[in-house]
Amino acid sequence: MSASSSRQLFDCGSLDWPNKSLFGDPTTRDVMHEHISSTWNAVIRRHMLAPNADAETILGRDGLPSAQFDAYGAMLPSFIQALNAPTTRLRITHRCPTAESILCADASHAPWLYMANNVCAYEATHLKPVQTFIAFDFAHGYCYLSLFIPLSFRITFENARSFSRFLEQLPDILGAYPTLAAIYKTMLFAIRLFPEVLQAPIPIIAKRPGVLQFHVSDARGLPPSWFPMKCGSVRSFVALITNNLNSDLLDGIVGSNGDGEHYTNWNSGHDHWIVNRFITVRDLHSSLKSALDVDLDTEGGRNAVLDLLLDLGVTNLVRREKRFPAHFQGAESVYLLLSCERVGNELVAVQDALQEPLANHSGLDLRALIINLGGLPSRHSDICYTRNIFENDNHLVWNFEFYRIASITRNAQIDRDMLSSSMANLFSNFVSESSNGQYRVKEPRPIAQYRVEHDEPVASGAPSAWWQVLIGITTAILGAIIFFLWRCFLRAKRVKFQAKDSFPWFTTSGDDDSPPPPGDSPSHPPGRSPDRVLPRTVVRDLSFNDDDDLHSVDLDEAGSRFGEVVSLIARGNLRELAGAIPESLSNLTLLQTSASGSGFYTMVALYLATLGDAITAFHEHNDASPTTTQSLRTVELQLEARGLRFNEAGTPANLIQRGVNSSVGRALVRLTQSALLATGEKFRTRMATTLERIAAERLNTLTAYDQRVIEMTTELLAAIKTALEVERSELTPHLANAEALLQVYNNLFSTDYASASLLALRREMILRSAEGRVGEQPTSASDAANEELVQRSMTKLDKEIELFQAQIDSQRRAVTITEASNLRENILQPINTVANIAMAGAFLRGGARHRMPGMPDVAAPMPNPFRAFSGRGHSLTTTRSGGLFRRPRV
């Protein structure tokens, strides 16, 4: 699309016929700045008149042609004859009334202004061509864009980028058919930002006689009998409007008639309101009263009430061309949404009760259920709508009335407050009238609100701190009592344990010596053999002593269950470990408090707790946190150094890491992505390959995550296949089902996949819907309207695609935030588990150390205190959380 222009100056000082030929001299063409030119190309593609559209007429408010360009041409008589219209409708000359003469002038003596020249547009005050585009015309309602074309040639190099952004936003801000006052405010804004455009010429702005309708002329000339405004430049236009701000002409629209009143920003996401059921509170109570008049002890009466409940409400209450009703006469005229799931559940419950046998429910029971339905508006006031509430909640604007957004929001809040205060009284009145005073609703206690206005700030004395001191002293006394009782409990355990001498010695020398008989004393005290040296690669933990190992454990004391745990760890079967860990942890907790070698039991309990969390994360989410894996490997090295054996194929931590890397579910997710990116036969081929892989993997042993991936992948591919093969008349529910399944798939498996086939179907459906709304019309004028509607539908389609892309971006941001939260949880959970178990073992180990019989009381060295963390901790404050969940800047 080339942006060509014409520049040929003729300054005659009046509207008289020029003394010089208009087309005798060659024209000179100016070139816009590169950024401005590219912006105009984008605006032209969106808002140009279609090449096959009828560009020779302007429609009036009645939908009929009100004028034709090139009025002095040879086609005018034929045009009037074809329309069978009176000649007064398309007359060429017209007297300029007094009310319009303040802005407009009579130009009947200058017939060349009404001729099409296919070269340029004219300026009004001086007959000279204006720089404008000549290869196309703007669509109906966007002719005002021609005013800003001459301004583009006056912009300096420094302001080129700013003016480009101004042009890019201009059609979206003003929309189609703006008022003359809106054009005036836009010009003032442009002058403020770009002072160099003040002297720029503008094309003629013409007004239709007797109608508040304006048109910015182009190369087609002026419509017949229309009056040009008394301005030919930006400066004269602003001065003319400024001197007549009180004129009613400023409310006139610039452009031809629109396509009727409608919700401006209605999109496909609002279409569900068309089929939703609504009912006013008055009609609901009236219907329920009629139901209560029926004999509910008979089957016929119950069937009649059932039919009444099934027919409640109306549909098609609101749509794009039909505004939500505005007859608001108290709370009884509010509309209740019956299609809501909460309301539907209550209605279904009553309907089921009506369909049951007569013996199950008496008539009084059914009357109570029906009376309870009268409280639906009071229990669900959030789905009660007035016009203000409906338009505010759905962000809808009627017929480009964007200036009413603030008042709609304010009035919606007023309606909400009124509903919350009056719905309870309506329900009480309904119950009293329908039950003849037998039932009563408990009235809420009124809350008196007082407002105190202080002329001066209230002076208050210094607060007393004695109550804080008293709380501190009481807390200290209670803590001392608890500590004293706990120490007494530990002493009682020591005395009791030392009185028993029933456990034999268990040597760990490594020789083949058999244990001594029960009556003899051991040859040497139990402990670690000096010939057993820990490897250098073992990571030592300062919270455990060197004598806490498997060789120091009395297996007779520990019992068979602990031996089974040791055997399970040696076998390394993750499924068996996952089932045995909860019971083993409870046994280990008992052994920590009542058996010798409690340090080793604490270490095993720590390992099993961390391993259980890791196995659960692996089976459910196919996830293995690096922090959890490192913690498991550290404890495994310590347990291996203390005599616990693991499977030769690898430790449980190694098996989990290998399982994550070779996950069947992850492989299927990648295959699904490859299938979703394809279309046509490639999609079907890749889908068949994926389904074959799923059928082969079903025979193997799978985790819960793998099974979930298989089920979701099979269901998603089946839904997409159904949407591709179904008839176009039944496409909408199947396409919505497939898109919903794809969204659930992305949420479950932390992906952001999109289906090329579904996007193509959605675009095709929107295009077919737009073409279906166009239809066929018998006249050329209606064809122009149809083409205009197609252009509007295409514009709506582009905006919906942009909205869909914005939704995808927001979902990606939500996935990123979720991954960050999961990462923080995976890091903190194993650390907290390790700290809690280790601190419990260290706290309880003090009483279990004295259980060994026959040992003299010697002063034992003070063990190193257990510390869960050695460095400065991270503070999880609201500031950090706010930084994590802060909305990214766009």
Swiss-Prot record:
Species classification: Viruses, Riboviria, Orthornavirae, Pisuviricota, Stelpaviricetes
Listed GO MF terms: cysteine-type endopeptidase activity; structural molecule activity
Name of encoding gene: RNA2
UniProt-recorded name of the protein: Genome polyprotein 2
Keyword Protease: yes
InterPro entries reported in the protein's UniProt record: HC-pro, HC_PRO_CPD_dom, HC_PRO_CPD_sf, TMV-like_coat, TMV-like_coat_sf
Top class in the EC scheme: hydrolase
Region of interest: Disordered: 507-533
Mod. after translation: The viral RNA2 of bymoviruses is expressed as a single polyprotein which undergoes post-translational proteolytic processing resulting in the production of at least two individual proteins. The HC-pro cleaves its C-terminus autocatalytically (Potential).
Gene Ontology annotations of biological process type: proteolysis
UniProtKB keywords: Hydrolase, Protease, Thiol protease
